[in-house]
Amino acid sequence: MKRGKVSDTILDRSVFKLLGRRGNTSKPAYGQDAAHIYSQGWDTLAAAATGSLAVYRAVNNISAAGGAADCIMNTIIIDEKSREIRLKEIIKELDRQCQVVGVGIAGGHTTVCPNVNRPVVSVTAIGHKLRTHQKAVAGQDIVMTKHIGMSGIRTVISHKRDEILNDLPEDVINKAFAADEELIIAKEAQIFIKQNIDGAMHDASEGGIFAALWDMAEYSGTGLDIDLRHISVKQEIIEICELFNINPYILDSMGCLLMTCENGCDIVNIMKQNGIEAAVIGKITDGNNRIIHNTEEDRYLGLPEQDEIYRFI
């Protein structure tokens, strides 16, 4: 299998079809990155993520599901060659990310395993529900916050900084490299929730904005009509992407939130009043056609592709 998220086909064939439904939990589904657990009057959300920014990913999943994160649990698998100082570095980084999003580490599991060649970190965020997770409905506008490719380009810069500096000034790197706070969607998600309007939310992450749009439509059972020209990407990110022939639309885009609602312009204005860039990028449509419009051509959105970051890690 390819590195990264497994395909929808594999998920359906080898995961979802084998799962029974037990207890008071939501059923796993495409585009649903957080589980809803209802027990004795408590509405709890749980979301898992892996990787160097796992805390942010897991907490973002809780936010996009209409909740607020309260704490995280972590699992750390260390290879036999790693020294104790490496474990300390991992814990310090997890704690630093927790400080950024305002949650604590409630517990976890740490083990040394001979079957890995580098540390593996998995995070599960646990939170409470602020509203019911909704599906998108035909006729709604699609609003996107911030810019695509922010988290992915951080990875590229981390691995290719010297090569980038051979062709581009350091100022380009500085402007392309997103601050940690830019990768968090909790603020805009809670602003959207407070409007008390019908609409879906989905955070972009691995697979980029194209994967996020596909997942949202697949979960909702709808089509899409997207204007590519309205999807915001920083010029500095474009310049770095061009150096390595990267497609920014399938590049990890953590920090970007998709929302659907009847009047997208109203949400855009509210976001901008709160210091968050946003734009209407298209509409939810009936049927299964998922169309991307560009200046030169129209195309159908296909199944999510492997994220471009796997060319660099």
Where are these regions (language model features)?
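Phosphate/diphosphate-binding glycine-rich loops and adjacent basic-rich segments that engage nucleotide
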Residues: 130-180
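Glycine-rich phosphate/pyrophosphate-binding loop regions near the starts of catalytic domains
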Residues: 2-144, 150
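Beta-strand->loop->alpha-helix junctions that form or flank phosphate-binding loops
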Residues: 26-29, 204-205, 223-232, 250-252, ...
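A short beta-alpha structural unit
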Residues: 254-260
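Solvent-exposed alpha-helices and their adjacent loops that cap or buttress functional pockets
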Residues: 27-29, 37-39, 98, 113-118, ...
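Helix N-cap motif at beta-to-alpha junctions
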Residues: 260-266
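Acidic, Ser/Thr/Pro-rich beta/coil linker or hinge segments at domain junctions
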Residues: 2-11, 272-313
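Active-site-proximal betaalpha loop/short-helix elements
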Residues: 79-81, 177-253
